[in-house]
Amino acid sequence: MQKLEELYSGKAKSIFKTDDADLFVMEFRDDTSAFDGVKKAKLSRKGEVNNKFNAFIMSKLAEAGVPVHFVRLLSERESLVKRLQMIPVECVVRNVAAGSLCRRLGVREGMVLTPPTYELFLKNDELHDPMINEHHARAFGWATDAQLEEMKALTFKVNDILKALFDAAGMTLVDYKLEFGLIDGKVTLGDEFSPDGCRIWDKATGEKMDKDRFRQDLGDVIEYYEEVGRRLGVQF
């Protein structure tokens, strides 16, 4: 397989074509940003850590029957993934109140949410990823009823799998976002799962172990990413 020209460059990853039209190379970079790109930095080893972390999680999900675009690791920073027709909707599950939920609804950080909440956001940087609902998605043609139902079902299946995984490793999976796409019409998990796109707290101390360390200037961002991975069994 040959890596060809760059197709897309996002905030922290780049996608490259290959000589197989159905496969892409996903490259994880050291770039880090927060607050819609207002705060930016390069964190040494971040690309390598997130690449291996994502490979571990995606493999666990695939073993549990979740359809994923991840195929295999290619290098320290690169993974081979299946080509998806992306659905421009982010699915967010919150097990514990934190971040924007607290600001929007005036609830205290750390409140356990039973049952977990489920929210949809339009993936659009210019509009700052506004919250939407199923009616918007259908009206504007972003997703069909069947796709929305499958995305929701898969998102909660992922929650069941990963909550248990993190809990057994002494951590709380506070919240996370997922993105989906289509392969021959089948809803499939895309993008990545890493501490960049979720909140993780130490169960014993409540210490934040995710991208909030960058957002809130808590320091040792990558060291905590690696600690999360080591507890789960990721080989760095």
UniProtKB/Swiss-Prot annotation:
UniProt entry keywords in alphabetical sequence: ATP-binding, Ligase, Nucleotide-binding, Purine biosynthesis
Catalytic activity entry: 5-amino-1-(5-phospho-D-ribosyl)imidazole-4-carboxylate + L-aspartate + ATP = (2S)-2-[5-amino-1-(5-phospho-beta-D-ribosyl)imidazole-4-carboxamido]succinate + ADP + phosphate + 2 H(+)
Record CDD domains: SAICAR_synt_PurC
Root EC class: ligase
InterPro entries: SAICAR_synt/ADE2_N, SAICAR_synt_PurC, SAICAR_synth, SAICAR_synthetase, SAICAR_synthetase_CS
Cross-referenced Gene3D superfamilies: ATP-grasp fold, B domain (3.30.470.20), Phosphorylase Kinase, domain 1 (3.30.200.20)
EC nos: 6.3.2.6
Pathway named in the protein's UniProt entry: Purine metabolism; IMP biosynthesis via de novo pathway; 5-amino-1-(5-phospho-D-ribosyl)imidazole-4-carboxamide from 5-amino-1-(5-phospho-D-ribosyl)imidazole-4-carboxylate: step 1/2
Protein's GO biological process: 'de novo' IMP biosynthetic process; cobalamin biosynthetic process
GO MF terms held by the record: ATP binding; phosphoribosylaminoimidazolesuccinocarboxamide synthase activity
GO cellular component: cytosol
NCBIfam families: purC (TIGR00081)
Family label: Belongs to the SAICAR synthetase family.
Protein's recorded name: Phosphoribosylaminoimidazole-succinocarboxamide synthase
Organism expressing this protein natively: Hahella chejuensis (strain KCTC 2396)
